Each structure stands twice: as C-alpha cells, then as structure tokens.
C-alpha cells in the first residue's frame, strides 16, 4: 500500500485524472455486468420454480389428486385409497348375518343308498328302511333354448257369405319379432353389463341358438328408451325430493368428439344426462334452479353455482387428496394439520349425533370446528400449490363443514363418483358412442337400471315394466 502511494505521488495531475477516469469506466462496466447477472439469476430462479411446479404436477396420482387411477404409473404395493387399515381379518366378521345357496325344496332328490348286503356279517339289507343322515346339493341350470310363440290369424266364413278374421295381439306387429323378455335381456346385457353389439350377438347365438343382428339390438334399445321417457323424468323429480343430492360429471366420446356425461343421484335414484357442454347451462337444463336441499359435489364451478337452498357440501376426499399431494411433495405441515382436522370433523359429527348430545352442545361443537377452520385458512402458504388451495378453500369455506349440522348429509361425494364410473367402463370397452341419439339413449336406460338397483328391484323385471310402460318407482 505504501509503495502504491509513493508511485502515485510521482505522477502528474493529468496522469492521475486519467487513472481515475479509467477506474470509473471499469466500475461502470462491472456494475452493468452485475446488473445483467442479477437479471439472469432472477430469470433462472423463475425457470427453476416453474420446473419444480411442473415436476410436482407430473408426480400427482390418484392418491394425491382427482386424477383417475388409470392414469397412474405402474407402482408396486401402492395404496390408492384414503382409507386406513382396520386391523380386521379379511372375510366375514363375527356376528354378520350369514347367507347360503342351500335350497329347502330342491327340484330333484337322489337317494344315495348303501350296498344291499352287510359288509360285516353278510346279511341282506332292506334299503326301504334307510334314513337320510346327510345332504349335499348341486346347483345347475336347465338346458337353454329359445321359446317361439306363433300367432295364427284364423278366419271363418258365415253361411251368408261374410268372412270374419281374428285379430293379432296389439304388441304383435311384424311377421317375426322379438318378445319383450328377450328385448329386456338385450337391454340388460348391453347397458348394465356393457356388452358391445358384436359380443352380444355372439352370446345370444351361443347360449340360445338365436341369431340376432345388430340392428335388432339397437331397435330394442330405442324402443325401451322411448317408452321409458316418462319414468326418466320421474327419476329427477324423486331425486330432488331428497334432503341431499350428489352431482358429478366426466368426459366421454360422442361422434369422435369430447362430450360430458353428468349425473345427479341420491338414495332414491340416479339420473344421467349427456351433453356437449360442461357449464352451468347443463345444470339449468336438467337439474333446474329450484332444489331445496343440500348439493354434495367437488369444486367444479357449475356445481358451485347450482341453486341449493340448504347449501353446498364440498367433497372431503377431493380436498384430502390435494392435501396428501402437498404432504408428499412439499412436506407441508399445514396440509398435514388440515387433513387431520377434516378427519376429526368427520368423526365428531357422528359422535355428537349418535351419543344423544343436546342441540345446544352440538351447536357449540360445530361452532368450535368452524372457528378452527378459519384459523387454518388464514395461515400463509409456503408454495404456489398451497396458496392456490388456500385461496379456493377460503372462497368456499362455508361449504366445507356444512355436513356437521345434519347426520344424513355425507361429507363426501363418493356415491356420485361410483355412479359416473360406468361411463368410463363403457368407454374402455366400446370406445364411445357413434351417434348423439345412442349416447342419449344410454343415459336414459342407465338411469332406469341404476335407480332400480338403489330401490332393490330386479333389473330385468324393471326393464320389462319399462317396455310395457307400467314402471313406477317408489317416492315419485
């Protein structure tokens, strides 16, 4: 340092000025480089954050989001459910009501007689004196064959010369046609068991020896759907009489394009509709704006905007799957605590109603849970995924704990997801619908069949009643 001072003292004034100007220029250049590096660092930080969020999205599966299980990568020993192990052994539990296929009045009895001679002393045995000591049954089906009824139109001529003709029954309109029971069976297999036309024609030929073309199957479906239209509308009426209704929608293929299959369902029935749209106009068209009960659903905007006078209940498993994602990917303590809180609220609701607590105590407990929820939602998130979820939950916080006020309202929308699952089964087997009418027809018939299941009715008998236009569901 002393050496530098001595050298500078030897320099002239002009030389010192040149050195200062040169250093100033170098400083300005370095500051410019620093500014460019800071901008580059800022850009790279944004890119890193975007890539981290993209990686997080790619790591989502059916356990940590609303994605279907079919989109999950193959993993060994992966738990796809939010349910915990119960600790019970598999199979029937002690005390459950037993069931048996044993028949009290068999169609045929075969006596398995012992030998006619004693194997010990050699004396003859009178088999008429034998007694039954044990029974075993074998269940079989009789040989299957088609049953053909021929209607012959008779004629007679009076002595005066007037010729009189008999009349065919009203339902016999063709020279050769399918009877109602056979039509019902075709509808049952195609809709309830999702058998495509080709496999259905093969099955009818193999089982019954009946050769049926695809057009005959389509005619049976169309006739049943047309005659079932009044009952189809009745299903929506009886659903809207219930205290709660669940709603959901999923994509399907119609004429090679993406359409949407909707469902509204309750304990009394299931209503399906097919539409090109996924917005609130579909709700107005099919569900209306006069529902008096509670609507259970995920957070899709069309459901959020649906008129439900008693309020909305958000599906907890949907929220919990997103919380599981935050726990798994971001190690988020807030998500863990909120997930635990939601599980506790579900148990608390059952407890305060099953243990006979007074209305005052129940109200106090519910208010405490609402206060705790508000405290959870005001905590600041540490990443964009958490902030997005918090923002949505804050907006819809009034519909997260609504179920606690009524023991009959579910905290989930699982029944709607089960109801809509058949659309995906249909898509995986058949790929979709070739026509709009085929899609609408399937929605009508599926509504009839799923409602019959919920009301404990025989599906085949229900389809026959729809064909004869005598079907009426309970509650409508």
Model-derived segments and their meaning:
Residues 1-174, 218, 247, 297:
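Short, flexible loop/hinge motifs at secondary-structure junctions
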Residues 3, 49, 154-157, 162-476:
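Catalytic center-proximal scaffold of phosphoryl-transfer enzymes
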């Amino acid at each position: 340092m002393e050496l530098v001072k001595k050298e500078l003292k030897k320099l002239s004034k002009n030389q010192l000025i040149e050195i200062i100007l040169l250093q100033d220029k170098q400083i300005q250049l370095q500051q410019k480089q620093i500014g460019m590096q800071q901008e580059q660092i800022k850009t790279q930080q944004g890119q890193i954050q975007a890539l981290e969020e993209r990686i997080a999205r790619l790591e989502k599966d059916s356990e940590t989001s609303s994605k279907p299980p079919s989109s999950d990568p193959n993993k060994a020993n992966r738990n796809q459910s939010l349910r915990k192990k119960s600790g019970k052994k598999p199979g029937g539990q002690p005390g459950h009501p037993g069931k048996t296929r044993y028949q009290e009045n068999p169609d045929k009895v075969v006596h398995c007689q012992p030998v006619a001679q004693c194997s010990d002393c050699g004396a003859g045995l009178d088999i008429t004196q034998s007694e039954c000591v044990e029974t075993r049954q074998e269940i079989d089906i009789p040989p299957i064959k088609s049953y053909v009824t021929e209607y012959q139109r008779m004629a007679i001529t009076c002595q005066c010369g007037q010729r009189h003709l008999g009349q065919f029954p009203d339902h016999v309109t063709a020279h050769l046609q399918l009877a109602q029971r056979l039509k019902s069976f075709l509808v049952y297999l195609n809709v309830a068991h999702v058998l495509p036309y080709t496999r259905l024609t093969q099955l009818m030929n193999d089982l019954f020896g009946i050769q049926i073309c695809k057009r005959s199957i389509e005619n049976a479906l169309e006739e049943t759907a047309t005659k079932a239209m009044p009952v189809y509308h009745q299903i929506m009426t009886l659903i809207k009489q219930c205290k709660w209704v669940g709603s959901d929608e999923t994509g399907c293929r119609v004429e090679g394009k993406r359409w949407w299959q909707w469902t509204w369902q309750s304990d009394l029935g299931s209503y399906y509709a097919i539409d090109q749209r996924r917005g609130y106009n579909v709700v107005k068209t099919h569900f209306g704006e006069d529902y008096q009960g509670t609507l259970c659903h995920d957070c899709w905007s069309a459901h959020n905007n649906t008129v439900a006078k008693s309020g909305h209940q958000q599906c907890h498993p949907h929220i919990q799957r997103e919380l599981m994602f935050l726990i798994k990917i971001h190690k988020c303590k807030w998500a863990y605590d909120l997930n635990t809180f939601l599980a506790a609220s579900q148990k608390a609701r059952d407890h305060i109603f099953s243990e006979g607590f007074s209305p005052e105590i129940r109200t106090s407990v519910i208010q405490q849970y609402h206060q705790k929820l508000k405290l959870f939602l005001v905590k600041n998130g540490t990443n964009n995924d958490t902030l997005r979820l918090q923002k949505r939950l804050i907006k819809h916080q009034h519909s997260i704990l609504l179920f606690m006020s009524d023991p009959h309202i579910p905290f989930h929308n699982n029944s709607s997801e089960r109801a809509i699952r058949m659309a995906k089964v249909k898509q995986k087997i058949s790929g979709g619908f070739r026509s709009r009418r085929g899609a609408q027809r399937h929605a009508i018939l599926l509504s009839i069949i799923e409602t019959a299941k919920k009301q404990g009715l025989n599906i085949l008998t229900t389809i026959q009643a729809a064909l004869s236009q005598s079907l009426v569901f309970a509650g409508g």
